[in-house]
UniProtKB/Swiss-Prot annotation:
It comes from Oryza sativa subsp. japonica. Residues 1-32 form the signal peptide. A motif (Prevents secretion from ER) lies at residues 666-669. It comes from the Eukaryota. It is found in: Endoplasmic reticulum. Glycans are attached at residue 423. This is Heat shock 70 kDa protein BIP3. Belongs to the heat shock protein 70 family. Residues 660-669 have a biased composition (Acidic residues). GO terms for cellular component: cytoplasm; endoplasmic reticulum chaperone complex; endoplasmic reticulum lumen; membrane; nucleus. The keyword Nucleus does not apply. Keywords: ATP-binding, Chaperone, Endoplasmic reticulum, Glycoprotein, Nucleotide-binding, Signal, Stress response. One of its GO terms (biological process) is protein refolding. Induction: By dithiothreitol-induced endoplasmic reticulum (ER) stress response. Induced by tunicamycin-induced ER stress response.
Amino acid sequence: MARGATWTRRLHLHGLFLAVLLLLTLPAGSTAAAGGGGGTVIGIDLGTTYSCVGVYRNGHVEIIANDQGNRITPSWVAFTGGGERLIGEAAKNQAAANPGRTVYDAKRLIGRRFADAEVQRDMRLLPFAVVDKGGKPHVRVEVRGGDVRLLSPEEVSAMVLARMKETAEAYLGEEVTRAVVTVPAYFNDAQRQATKDAATIAGLAVERILNEPTAAALAYGVGKEGAGGKNVLVFDLGGGTFDVSVLAIDGGVYEVLATNGDTHLGGEDFDQRVMEHFVELVRRKHGRDIAGDARALGKLRRECERAKRALSIQHQVRVEVESLFDGVDLSEPLSRARFEELNNDLFRKTMAPVRKAMADARLSNADIDEIVLVGGSTRIPKVRQLLRDYFGGKQPNQGVNPDEAVAYGAAIQANIVGGDTDNKTRDMVVLDVTPLTLGLETAGGVMATLIPRNTPVPTKRAQLFSTYKDKQTTVTVKVFEGERSMTRDNRLLGRFDLAGIAPAPRGAPQIEVAFEVDADGILSVSAADRATGRSERITISGDDRKTSREEIDRMLGEAEEFADEDRRHRERAGARNSLEAYVYGVKNAVVGGEMAGAMDGGEKEKVEAAVMEAYEWLDGNQDVGKEEYEEKLRELEDVCNPVMSAVYQRSGGSRRDGDGGGDDDHDEL
């Protein structure tokens, strides 16, 4: 269902600018991923609070469980006092005891300016330090003893993506270098590009950036190609972001009609309201302000999230935190009604994007055939009720797992762009749209629209401008996104100068400015002087938010450094475990075990002394290197193995040296 290329020309005046509009919509099929090499392409849902990875194999999607057996992984990274890096459940589980070195919510910072209001608001709520570096927010964290680093949101996200990559590799038994990565539909260019940079740092070539609601629609629609055309509304309310997309699905073609949302609304905002409620309650009851106590807030945050989840199936829960501060325990009830009251305005805020998306799609409520819920926050009964009421009692579709739908759809898209399609995915086509209007500033600060919101992508549109002063030799192109008529009310994406224009009366030069949005939703802008042929071109990602090639290379180096450090920690832990297993095995064999009665006094005393010395050495050497543990194991084996071998030979046994603690035991462990 490729769209034919069409050109439209219009002539009009923008203040003191002369403009000719050239409209071009590229064929949707022209952007099929060329493929970044061989190998399996995986689908990754990089979430604010949880991430998920899937692969399409043997005619169906497989959501891959992590090493803990869980199909979703917390998007958390931590650095311990011993210099170990933790990712996922391990990081989240120790957060209350290590708040300043546990990082989360990177998705709320990625691609943003440090000065953004959302960043400034989040900084007050996060227990770790967020600082300004080159106009971008960075996390200041001690990664190991005295080694303090400034980590960009891209680097933190890359650590989570790398864990998703490792999870897939362990499952597939092969190296993975290609992925489809999802982003909120309302992510802007800077946020999309920053997400691609994070994947690059993680060692992944991004075959496609896919909007999360579109991915969920793929998850809903796969296998239903013969069901006839349907209009589907995807309501995606996750941990940190909110999207609404309206799609027309017909015979394998998924056409996004409209999208809307809020990149800073989700389950964490609901948790924060509950936390603020209990912080105030503690202030009233105990006269103590814990708002600045990172450890107390860490404990409270975890319990408030648990309570929120429980209230989706219960009408009342008890919020209990042992030793919240100074030995004082918190044990208070929280009803579903109170939870809904605390978040009432936020819940109702989700309906505005629904109304806007429906209006942009030019559909009535009765035109929607299915409502697909995505994101853990859609389990909240009040959210479902508001959505049900808006659509006149229509029940949402229950066939898609809200936690896994986005990764499921990403895996389908990964199969498509990887070229390994089957009869289920071969004819699937995704036609997505731009979420916001794109334009540039003209005389007087007026916004000149080049690409209206909800324009199908990929697309390219061009417009002719001229100078507004006599003999003007340089023009500045300022690129904005937003729906307001004046650029001061919209978001500046980037700017560049086109110099070397031949001096001429104002209005005479012809300067063609072209906007091009690719299938990933990333905008490129070019400007060319038709008289001289001079041109400039940039990929918009916000100059003050754009990650340079040098920065990416540095981050790649640090990622390898962290990976090496992780490997050393694993090897050190393995060596210590081997030593401990041998010590415990020998002890069990000698003290009350089968060998106890077969040893003479001198042999038993010698082995027991060696074991006791090893116990003491282990207690005093918690963090030595792999080599020290291996050397200590060799020393202990040199003492114990000959004795135990001799005992077995005397007793007619045939076990080889070392079986008393034996190599088999510690290999299995």
